[in-house]
């Protein structure tokens, strides 16, 4: 009986050492890379860096036009690469210039489009006159 116990203990120690002893071949813990946050565009100086006429497709996000691709597939890519403040500024420009072809409640429409594109309208933001 004693040889069986000794063999059991020896094998247990061997397996424990093998499981914890992978030092040369073990990879370290995976450290996630921080998300890339675009820097505010310094070239816009209070102007939309994209053509406001292209934002006409954003009327689809409001559910007012239903033709072709799903609403977000045309509007949201136009806002990619812009920080939330620049995206809000561009949409304000489009809404106020009536390039969407409809009269809208600016704050509600702006928030709705930004939220549907995964953006957040800055709390203290108001569309410039």
Swiss-Prot record:
Could you tell me which residues belong to the region 2 X 6 AA tandem repeats of P-V-V-P-T-P? 29-40
Instruction: For this UniProt record, give its keywords in alphabetical order, as a comma-separated list.
Output: Glycoprotein, Repeat, Signal
Stretches assigned to coiled coil: none
Tissue expression, as annotated, is: Cortical ground meristem of developing roots.
Glycosylation sites recorded in the entry for this protein: 25
Source species, please?
Answer: Zea mays (Maize)
Superkingdom of this entry's organism?
Eukaryota
Question: Per its UniProt record, what InterPro entries does this chain match?
Answer: Bifun_inhib/LTP/seed_sf, Bifunc_inhib/LTP/seed_store, Hydrophob_seed_dom, Plant_LTP/defense-related
- According to the record, the signal peptide region is 1-19
The sequence repeat ranges on this chain = 29-34, 35-40
* Database matches in CDD domains: HPS_like
What's the stated role of this polypeptide? Delineates a novel subset of developing cortical cells. It is probably involved in some aspect of transport of molecules to or from the vasculature.
Q: Which family does it belong to?
A: To carrot DC2.15 and PEMB3.
- This protein is called Cortical cell-delineating protein
Q: Which SMART domains match?
A: AAI
């Amino acid at each position: 009986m004693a040889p069986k116990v000794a063999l059991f203990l020896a094998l247990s120690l061997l397996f424990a050492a093998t499981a914890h002893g992978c030092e040369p071949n073990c990879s370290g813990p995976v450290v996630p890379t921080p998300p890339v946050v675009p820097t505010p565009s310094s070239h816009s100086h209070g102007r939309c860096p994209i053509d406001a006429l292209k934002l006409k497709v954003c009327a689809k996000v409001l559910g007012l036009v239903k033709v072709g691709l799903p609403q977000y597939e045309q509007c949201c890519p136009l806002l990619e690469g812009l920080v939330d403040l620049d995206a809000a500024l561009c949409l304000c420009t489009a809404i106020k210039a009536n390039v969407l072809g409809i009269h809208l409640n600016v704050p509600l429409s702006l928030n709705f489009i930004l939220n549907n594109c995964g953006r957040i309208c800055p709390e203290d933001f108001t569309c410039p006159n």
